[in-house]
């Protein structure tokens, strides 16, 4: 990674204005159901406190549409942060985001203390990246730290705009994400295998196109595999399919051949007569999918083939489930991929789980800690895999 990080700053007596990603899931009572994103920010916050800084944290939560909404207040996050960060001398919260009240709260901060600003999306200027809001935020710190990889693909006032008004560096989480995903894409240990799943090919065209020039093998699963099977002239019954994307699938298969990348499709599938955990189900070869049935998972021969590819790889990136993993009978393929990746990692391969549903699948399987890296950013991971420059990263100072 060619950007400055928090290690490049002398923090003694400085105020660190840190964009974190505290966009955590809440239940109906406003209780946090998964604090992974809060925990992911702790190494950066701890480092800053240990090195004599006071820390001002900003984040969005949910989609409050540019106005205050108690449902999306960061109050529960502050309470959880207080529990997770006993070494902070104090964790304070302000109802303000910018302006005199926020500036007064920051002026009271002493080294070793933490202040959490209210949800940045309560301000209608946040998402349009209004320079006036960015300049107001910049008054709250001496150095801007971006540790919110999950929003690095969005040019908001608190992720990109503020970096034009303060020295800007990456936090440890941002650095880790860019080092793992960027390293795998730009300088992979080979064989380099990617596993791409999920429902729609249209969501992942850019990813597949970018990867075809880099990978040794691309393993396709999930609903998008049906569109590839249809493009090969196979009948997919009542399966989820995108007829409009058939020409794209044909182009991608041709491009894979041109570039010497092996694009592997399922050879057998688990089909059901309804979209339900209680449906009748059977395993068939992809050439034998009957009318009225739908593909809901990859089959055992495909699992064996894909698992062997993963275990033989030195770098693996996975994005998207292999089937309808939220229905227990159709989670087998997705779990098997997670297991094969854990085995590859145990043998010294770099294994990266790239955001979204794959992360949930790996966590459900209890294998998250067996991976080299589990990404915290769904959309941001996808854009990196597409080869795009992330605005929140581009705005940081280059390493010298």
From Swiss-Prot:
Pfam families per record: PGK
Enzyme Commission designation: 2.7.2.3
Species name: Chloroflexus aurantiacus (strain ATCC 29366 / DSM 635 / J-10-fl)
Pathway, per record: Carbohydrate degradation; glycolysis; pyruvate from D-glyceraldehyde 3-phosphate: step 2/5
First-level EC class: transferase
HAMAP family (UniProt xref): Phosphoglyc_kinase (MF_00145)
Protein name, per record: Phosphoglycerate kinase
Chief subcellular location: cytoplasm
């Amino acid at each position: 990674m060619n950007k400055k990080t928090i290690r490049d700053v002398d923090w003694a007596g400085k105020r660190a204005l840190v964009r974190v990603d505290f966009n955590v899931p809440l239940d109906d009572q406003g209780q946090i159901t998964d604090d992974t994103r809060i925990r992911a920010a702790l190494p950066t916050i701890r480092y800053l406190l240990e090195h004599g800084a006071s820390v001002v944290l900003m984040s969005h939560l949910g989609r409050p549409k540019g106005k205050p909404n108690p449902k999306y207040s960061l109050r529960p996050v502050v309470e959880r942060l207080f529990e997770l960060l006993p070494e902070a001398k104090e964790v304070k919260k302000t109802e303000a985001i910018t302006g005199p009240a926020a500036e007064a709260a920051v002026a009271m901060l002493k080294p070793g203390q933490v202040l959490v600003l209210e949800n940045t999306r309560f301000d209608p200027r946040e998402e349009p990246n209004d320079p006036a809001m960015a300049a107001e935020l910049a008054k709250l710190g001496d150095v801007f730290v971006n540790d919110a990889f999950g929003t690095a693909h969005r040019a908001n006032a608190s992720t990109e705009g503020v970096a034009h008004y303060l020295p800007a560096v990456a936090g440890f989480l941002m650095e880790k994400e860019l080092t793992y995903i960027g390293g795998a894409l730009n300088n992979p240990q080979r064989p380099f295998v990617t596993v791409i799943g999920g429902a729609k090919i249209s969501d992942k065209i850019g990813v597949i196109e970018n990867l075809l020039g880099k990978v040794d093998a691309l393993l396709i699963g999930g609903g998008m595999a049906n569109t590839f099977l249809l493009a090969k002239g196979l009948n997919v019954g009542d399966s989820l399919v995108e007829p409009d994307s058939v020409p794209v699938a044909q182009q991608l298969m041709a491009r894979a051949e041109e570039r010497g990348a092996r694009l592997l499709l399922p050879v057998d599938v688990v089909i059901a007569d309804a979209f339900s955990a209680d449906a009748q189900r059977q395993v068939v070869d992809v050439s034998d999918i009957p009318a009225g049935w739908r593909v809901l998972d990859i089959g055992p021969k495909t699992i064996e083939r894909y698992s062997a590819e993963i275990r033989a790889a030195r770098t693996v990136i996975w994005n998207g489930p292999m089937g309808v993993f939220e229905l227990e009978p159709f989670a087998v393929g997705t779990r098997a991929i997670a297991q094969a990746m854990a085995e590859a990692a145990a043998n010294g391969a770099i294994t990266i789980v790239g955001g979204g549903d794959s992360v949930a699948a790996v966590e459900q399987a209890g294998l998250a800690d067996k991976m080299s890296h589990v990404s915290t950013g769904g959309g941001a991971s996808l854009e990196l895999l597409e080869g795009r420059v992330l605005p929140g990263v581009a705005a940081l100072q280059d390493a010298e």
